[in-house]
């Protein structure tokens, strides 16, 4: 990849904290029974985001919600373009039948990752409802998928990249827009 021409901070650590609090509040408001809520983070950055949202929901409501990690490697429709990758480990320890599942991802772009995640979820039961929470929605969909919960709407050029940094994974919290 070429050297970035510009890097713009979109969310600072404090902005990210506020955004996660707002997302958690919205999820709580739209969930009829929090005891049936399961947050499924999509590898890679969706996993720690799901954990952060679960902690925030516990802070807000005093309830532990289910959290899992979803690897979509074998459900992707672009394996011929990106090549086979070593799959991460899906970690879903409960039957999703009848649950309110919120898929969590860092950035939604074309929508293809979420399409693959929807296919993968069916391997673990039939949820009552599946919703989608994303930290950043940058537009440019290629499939008709729309998130239910959005931290930040960020119109971008197709060649720009949104980078999400999380303390537990990267040593800092931030969201940046990188232009080339």
Curated annotation (Swiss-Prot):
A single GO BP: regulation of DNA-templated transcription
TM spans (from-to): none
Residue sites binding substrate per the record: 44-45, 85, 105-113, 138, 162
Class of the enzyme per the UniProt entry, highest EC level: transferase
EC code(s) of this entry: 2.4.2.9
CDD domains recorded: PRTases_typeI
SUPFAM superfamilies: PRTase-like
Keyword Transmembrane among UniProt keywords: no
Domain of life: Bacteria
Record's catalysed reaction(s): UMP + diphosphate = 5-phospho-alpha-D-ribose 1-diphosphate + uracil
One function term, GO molecular function aspect: uracil phosphoribosyltransferase activity
InterPro entries (alphabetical): PRibTrfase_dom, PRTase-like, PyrR, PyrR_bifunctional
Keywords (A to Z) from UniProt: Glycosyltransferase, Transcription, Transcription regulation, Transferase
Motif residue range(s): PRPP-binding: 101-113
Keyword Transferase: yes
Role of this protein: Regulates the transcription of the pyrimidine nucleotide (pyr) operon in response to exogenous pyrimidines.
HAMAP family named among the record's database cross-references: PyrR
Family per similarity comment: Belongs to the purine/pyrimidine phosphoribosyltransferase family. PyrR subfamily.
Xref: PANTHER family: BIFUNCTIONAL PROTEIN PYRR
Full protein name: Bifunctional protein PyrR
This protein's encoding gene: pyrR
């Amino acid at each position: 990849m070429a050297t970035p021409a510009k890097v713009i901070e979109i969310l600072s650590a404090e902005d990210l904290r506020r955004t996660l609090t707002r997302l958690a509040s919205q999820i709580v408001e739209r969930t009829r029974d929090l005891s049936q809520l399961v947050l499924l983070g999509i590898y890679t950055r969706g996993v720690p985001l799901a954990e952060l949202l679960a902690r925030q929901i516990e802070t807000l409501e005093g309830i532990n919600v289910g959290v899992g990690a979803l690897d979509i490697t074998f459900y992707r429709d672009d394996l011929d373009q990106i090549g086979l990758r070593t799959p991460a480990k899906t970690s879903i320890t409960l039957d999703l039948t009848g649950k309110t599942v919120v898929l969590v991802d860092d950035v939604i772009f074309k929508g293809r990752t979420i399409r693959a995640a929807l296919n993968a979820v069916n391997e673990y039961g039939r949820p009552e409802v599946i919703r989608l929470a994303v930290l950043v929605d940058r537009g440019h969909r290629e499939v008709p998928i729309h998130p239910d919960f959005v931290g930040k709407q960020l119109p971008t050029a197709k060649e720009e990249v949104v980078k999400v940094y999380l303390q537990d994974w990267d040593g800092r919290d931030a969201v940046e827009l990188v232009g080339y």
